[in-house]
């Protein structure tokens, strides 16, 4: 039986970008499918999970939550993106110029996840970049971008990745991503 909207865990889910943990096929601890987090592959190094902000902590949406609330993974994804968009307002998301790049600031936790919001890149951030975007997301709370044709900006993104990666927490990617035709792809070496 589905829960009412007032008791729904899934309705509060926020899409959250996470690094894929290498899998050797042997689980460290056997866990029932219902107890595992809902995971949507983004690319070969990143995935989308769904978190519920419970003020004192963040809780992963698990497969059992989908079953209990009779919601599909695709519907969860739409809910998660909508709630991530709402976070840009409630967490005061803003773009801050920094040397040759633009930093996206939003109170920690969800900055890198903002690459999932097409509306930001197609409209809100368009005033900062004329061509294709280049973005670095080395950790969950770090997102910076520039025009992909601006070599000084690309170098600054590389420097940012190098600064964040060794000591970083909740690391995501050491790659620069290029947004072309509405999708993000790792920059070719």
Give residue spans per PLM region.
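Structural alpha-beta junctions
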Residues: 86-90, 127-131, 164-172
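Short, well-ordered loop/turn elements at secondary-structure boundaries
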Residues: 42-46, 54, 98-99, 128-132, ...
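Residues in well-ordered beta-strands of folded domains
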Residues: 49-51, 105, 136, 146, ...
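Short amphipathic alpha-helix segments
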Residues: 112-126
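Charged, alpha-helical interface segments at or near domain boundaries
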Residues: 1-113
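Amphipathic protein-protein interaction modules
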Residues: 125-153
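C-terminal structured domains
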Residues: 141, 147-189
């Amino acid at each position: 039986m589905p829960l009412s909207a007032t008791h729904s865990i899934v309705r509060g889910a926020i899409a959250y970008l996470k690094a894929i943990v290498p899998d050797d096929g042997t689980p460290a601890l056997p866990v029932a499918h219902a107890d595992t987090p809902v995971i949507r592959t983004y690319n070969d190094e990143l995935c989308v999970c769904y978190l519920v902000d419970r003020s004192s902590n963040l809780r992963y949406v698990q497969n059992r939550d989908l079953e209990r609330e009779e919601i599909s993974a695709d519907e969860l994804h739409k809910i998660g993106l909508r709630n991530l968009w709402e976070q840009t307002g409630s967490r005061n998301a803003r773009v801050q110029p920094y040397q040759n790049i633009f930093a996206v600031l939003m109170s920690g936790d969800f900055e890198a996840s903002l690459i999932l919001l097409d509306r930001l890149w197609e409209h809100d951030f368009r005033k900062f970049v004329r061509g294709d975007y280049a973005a670095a997301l080395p950790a969950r709370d770090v997102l910076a971008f520039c025009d992909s044709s601006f070599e000084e900006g690309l170098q600054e993104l590389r420097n940012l990745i190098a600064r964040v990666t060794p000591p970083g927490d909740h690391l995501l990617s050491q790659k620069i991503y290029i947004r072309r035709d509405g999708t993000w792809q790792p920059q070719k070496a």
